[in-house]
């Protein structure tokens, strides 16, 4: 019988995995089995947090807009402001409004005065 030498495919797969997990701490960057488990876990977390990031930024934008709008008066709120925007067909999204609220509050006051 001739001797069959192992191929390079498994080694290539482990090398790729090691490159991915090289920044992990302890055994998670050295042992193959724990490396695979941590790689799966990291990818699951990344996938979940990409969706969560969208929610978190939307909440942040709404909070920033609301904080600046409420300085005008107690009776005026974020929901009334957004309602007035839609009523007057001003197409500004929350991200842009939040940037305006931080960088130039007077501009946001002008927008809110125009739509009221």
From Swiss-Prot:
Name of this protein: Large ribosomal subunit protein bL20c
PANTHER family in the cross-refs: 39S RIBOSOMAL PROTEIN L20
NCBIfam families (UniProt xref): rplT_bact (TIGR01032)
Cited function: Binds directly to 23S ribosomal RNA and is necessary for the in vitro assembly process of the 50S ribosomal subunit. It is not involved in the protein synthesizing functions of that subunit.
Classification via HAMAP family: Ribosomal_bL20
Coiled-coil zones: none
Lineage: Eukaryota, Viridiplantae, Streptophyta, Embryophyta, Tracheophyta
Database matches in InterPro entries: Ribosomal_bL20, RIBOSOMAL_L20_CS, Ribosomal_protein_bL20_C
A Pfam family this chain is assigned to: Ribosomal_L20
Domain of life: Eukaryota
UniProt KW keywords: Chloroplast, Plastid, Ribonucleoprotein, Ribosomal protein, RNA-binding, rRNA-binding
GO cellular component: chloroplast; ribonucleoprotein complex; ribosome
An example Gene Ontology molecular-function term: rRNA binding
Principal location: plastid
Any single biological process term in GO: translation
Family stated for the protein in its record: Belongs to the bacterial ribosomal protein bL20 family.
Compartments it resides in: Plastid, Chloroplast
């Amino acid at each position: 019988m001739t001797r069959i030498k192992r191929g390079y495919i498994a080694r290539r797969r482990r090398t790729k995995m090691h490159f991915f997990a090289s920044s992990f701490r302890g055994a998670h960057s050295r042992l193959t089995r724990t490396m695979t488990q941590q790689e799966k876990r990291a990818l699951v977390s990344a996938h979940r947090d990409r969706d969560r990031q969208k929610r978190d930024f939307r909440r942040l934008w709404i909070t920033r807009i609301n904080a600046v709008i409420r300085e005008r008066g107690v009776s005026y709120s974020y929901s009334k402001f957004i309602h007035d925007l839609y009523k007057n067909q001003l197409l500004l999204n929350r991200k842009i409004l939040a940037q305006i609220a931080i960088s130039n509050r007077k501009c946001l006051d002008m927008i809110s005065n125009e739509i009221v």
